[in-house]
């Protein structure tokens, strides 16, 4: 039986993770693994924080803290963020574990023993001002390949090419910004050229994504050169040699980080009491293991060229039980880049969607759904707040959530929550059941091909089919004439609901669990669909998804982007919203004083910031005012708005005429406080649909910015009486 060793790129423990990281490596890996588990496959999903990279040292120096403090903080931060967004690692560890130190040093010594390392005296970047050697990331300059400025000395973020400080144009110290010099230093290099032909032949045989395979073969064709695997740095894994010129030197993180996949697997099986089980996944014992690395575009050369070379350089692993070659990567389904509103994510400018912040405002399933629907599988894609809102509301809420709620509400209302017997099937009924089977087959195939965006679309197509089936069958009509026919419709609708509960598990695990709960199922989900039996009792449903609102998006931009990067917040807010709408949210969420202070910080001179009551009075003529028809009415019914959290739908008696009004009073009045109240309404206001419900007038109320109070006559008067 094939077994899967699935990894996701080890995130640097120097800061939080953002939506670009999630869409690039972690969400696709999680979808793939969740599907394999549903299929009953043998799969282990491993990840952990990379805790020795120069980004950690860089942040520690900037913040005058120790690297240990930095990695301890962000290991927990990143781990929690992954848990909140429901990334289901079997184990999430860290490269500061002793097993990782031991294994990394072992890889170094084996490569040295096998003749693949060479010691060289070379010139290393050195800052005369700060009196220290500079790791590649501590050097910035212009990329010689694409001309991008302010690129680090290890890799160009624009074209993705590996770099060294020596080839940068006008290299400078990243801290003091002074030009650097180069001093002699002794280091070990791996002879990458010795693996060139073997790597080329190995990669040519792979059925990898074209964007990965073509990029890697292109680099190899240009020729591989010796690359340093030790460096002058005081934070990292010490070089395991008692040599004078190796004192105070550590293993290069790009050498030891991928070894973390193995060391973390060893740690995982040790913790679950199976200390030798890791060998089945990392050693080629029977040819049945598929090692799959999910990464972002910037990690392709390290995983597809250098990492396989390290495994080859080690040679055979041998202990008292086994002797075998290492498993080389079976597949590397790297994704391209995710941009934000047309621009590259920038952590330094806070031009990013940080996962922990986004989940403070929106559910995890919303982020998972949107990112999967735009996943940059073969080309770059863009995160747009407008598109996010549209996709959530028009697809997740109106299609998927609507169908599940309709089917479950109907069976509870007309069949006491009991799955009805199925009568004779017509052509559409049979087509519905065929759609279920076809969707499972197609979605599974697409997931195995790493086409997660198309797979999710197929799932949503089934939900859309369910809605169309329900509409065509019109059970709300047939229930009055033919309960048996209606029972068949509802039975099949519930089969689609159950199918969705399974199909959504890889993509939207929270929604999947809710559907399973609504269906009152205790069986373990599997990819093999079995029907709900007639007579099974289901629960009453709740709303599966609530609409994403402009207020939520404004709040997110204000509270998170606005605090650290006011210019970025202003750019987004001006792109989508009127200033008065932003002001309303700011004052509602942060209070009068703090809200206006925040708006002045973001909009500067564009925001005048008058408090309520301070605005200059604007007059209307008596003729204009006399056009307004104000009437006395009585509230006779109060209902929650079906599509909005802050609105009521109220019915007002104007004396022989009942008007339906939409009122934003939910925050200020309970339904029972409004019922039977006399109110003043604008009776000749043009009707307008508010969130799908037509409002035939407007209630009048006083608003001081904190409290809202309805205007009411101080004694009972005839309903419909004019206010003059």
Curated annotation (Swiss-Prot):
Source organism superkingdom: Archaea
Compartment(s) of residence: Cytoplasm
GO molecular function, one term: metal ion binding
Residue ranges of domain tRNA-binding in the record: 624-724
Cellular component terms per the entry's GO annotation: cytosol
Binding annotation for ATP: 347
Keywords annotated in UniProt: Aminoacyl-tRNA synthetase, ATP-binding, Cytoplasm, Ligase, Metal-binding, Nucleotide-binding, Protein biosynthesis, RNA-binding, tRNA-binding, Zinc
Motif range ('KMSKS' region): 344-348
Gene Ontology biological process terms from the UniProt entry: methionyl-tRNA aminoacylation
Database matches in SUPFAM superfamilies: Anticodon-binding domain of a subclass of class I aminoacyl-tRNA synthetases (SSF47323), Methionyl-tRNA synthetase (MetRS), Zn-domain (SSF57770), Nucleic acid-binding proteins (SSF50249), Nucleotidylyl transferase (SSF52374)
Catalytic activity, reaction form: tRNA(Met) + L-methionine + ATP = L-methionyl-tRNA(Met) + AMP + diphosphate
Keyword Transit peptide: no
Pfam families, A to Z: Anticodon_3 (PF19303), tRNA-synt_1g (PF09334), tRNA_bind (PF01588)
Cofactor detail note: Binds 1 zinc ion per subunit.
EC number assigned by the record: 6.1.1.10
Protein function: Is required not only for elongation of protein synthesis but also for the initiation of all mRNA translation through initiator tRNA(fMet) aminoacylation.
The protein's name: Methionine--tRNA ligase
Organism name: Pyrococcus furiosus (strain ATCC 43587 / DSM 3638 / JCM 8422 / Vc1)
Gene name per UniProt: metG
């Amino acid at each position: 039986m094939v077994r899967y060793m699935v990894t996701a790129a080890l995130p640097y423990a120097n800061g939080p993770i953002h939506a670009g990281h999630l869409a690039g490596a972690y969400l696709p890996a999680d979808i793939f693994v969740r599907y394999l588990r549903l299929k009953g496959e043998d799969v282990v999903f491993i990840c952990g924080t990379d805790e020795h990279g120069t980004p950690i040292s860089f942040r520690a120096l900037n913040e005058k803290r120790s690297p240990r403090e930095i990695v301890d903080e962000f290991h927990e931060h990143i781990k929690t963020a992954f848990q909140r967004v429901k990334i289901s690692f079997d184990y999430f560890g860290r490269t500061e574990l002793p097993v990782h130190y031991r294994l990394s040093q072992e890889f170094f010594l084996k490569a040295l023993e096998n003749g693949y390392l060479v010691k060289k005296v070379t010139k290393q970047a050195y800052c005369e001002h700060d009196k220290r050697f500079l790791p590649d990331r501590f050097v910035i300059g212009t990329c010689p390949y694409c001309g991008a400025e302010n690129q680090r000395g290890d890799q160009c973020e624009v074209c993705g090419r590996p770099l060294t400080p020596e080839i940068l144009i006008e290299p400078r110290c990243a801290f003091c910004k002074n030009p650097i010099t180069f001093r002699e230093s002794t280091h070990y290099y791996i002879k990458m050229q010795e693996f060139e032909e073997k790597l080329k032949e190995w990669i040519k045989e792979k059925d990898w994504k074209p964007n990965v395979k073509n990029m890697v073969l292109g680099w190899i064709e240009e020729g591989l050169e010796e690359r340093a695997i030790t460096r002058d740095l005081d934070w990292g894994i010490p070089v395991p040699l008692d040599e004078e010129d190796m004192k105070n030197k550590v293993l290069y993180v790009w050498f030891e980080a991928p070894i973390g996949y193995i060391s973390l697997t060893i740690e995982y099986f040790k913790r679950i009491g199976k200390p030798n089980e890791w060998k089945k996944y990392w050693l080629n014992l029977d040819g049945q293991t598929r090692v799959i690395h999910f990464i972002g575009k910037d990690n392709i050369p390290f995983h597809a060229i250098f990492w396989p070379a390290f495994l080859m350089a080690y040679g055979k692993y041998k202990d008292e039980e086994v002797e075998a070659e290492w498993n080389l990567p079976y597949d590397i389904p790297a994704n391209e880049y995710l941009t934000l509103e047309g621009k590259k994510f920038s952590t330094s400018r806070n031009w990013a969607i940080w996962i922990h912040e986004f989940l403070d405002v929106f559910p995890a399933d919303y982020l998972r759904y949107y990112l999967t629907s735009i996943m940059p599988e073969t080309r770059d894609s863009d995160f747009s707040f407008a598109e996010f809102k549209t996709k959530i509301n028009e697809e997740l809420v109106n299609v998927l959530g609507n169908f599940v709620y309709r089917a479950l509400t109907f069976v509870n209302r007309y069949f006491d929550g009991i799955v009805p017997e199925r009568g004779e099937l017509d052509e559409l009924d049979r087509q519905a059941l065929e759609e279920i089977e076809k969707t499972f087959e197609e979605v599974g195939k697409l997931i195995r091909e790493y086409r997660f965006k198309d797979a999710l679309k197929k799932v949503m197509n089934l939900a859309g089919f369910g809605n169309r089936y329900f509409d065509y069958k019109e059970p709300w009509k047939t229930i009055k004439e033919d309960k048996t026919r209606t029972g068949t419709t509802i039975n099949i609708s519930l089969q689609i609901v159950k199918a969705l509960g399974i199909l959504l598990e890889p993509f939207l695990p929270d929604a999947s669990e809710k559907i399973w709960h609504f269906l009152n199922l205790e069986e373990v989900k599997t990819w093999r669909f079995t029907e709900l039996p007639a007579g099974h009792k289901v629960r009453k449903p709740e709303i599966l998804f609530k609409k994403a609102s402009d207020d939520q998006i404004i709040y997110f931009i204000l509270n998170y982007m606005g605090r650290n990067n006011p210019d970025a917040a202003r750019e987004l807010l001006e792109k989508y919203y009127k200033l008065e709408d932003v002001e309303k949210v700011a004052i509602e969420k942060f209070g009068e004083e703090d809200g206006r202070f925040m708006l002045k910080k973001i909009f500067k001179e564009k925001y005048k910031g008058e408090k309520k009551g301070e605005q200059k009075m604007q007059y209307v003529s008596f003729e204009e005012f006399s056009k307004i028809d104000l009437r006395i009415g009585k509230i006779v019914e109060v209902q929650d708005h079906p599509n909005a959290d802050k609105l009521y739908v109220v019915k007002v008696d104007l004396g022989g005429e009942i008007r339906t009004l939409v009122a934003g009073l939910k925050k200020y009045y309970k339904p029972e406080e409004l019922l039977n109240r006399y109110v003043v309404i604008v009776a000749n206001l043009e009707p307008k649909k508010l969130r799908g419900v037509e409002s035939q007038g407007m209630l009048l109320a006083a608003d001081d910015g904190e409290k809202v109070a309805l205007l009411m006559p101080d004694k009972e008067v005839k309903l419909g009486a004019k206010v003059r």
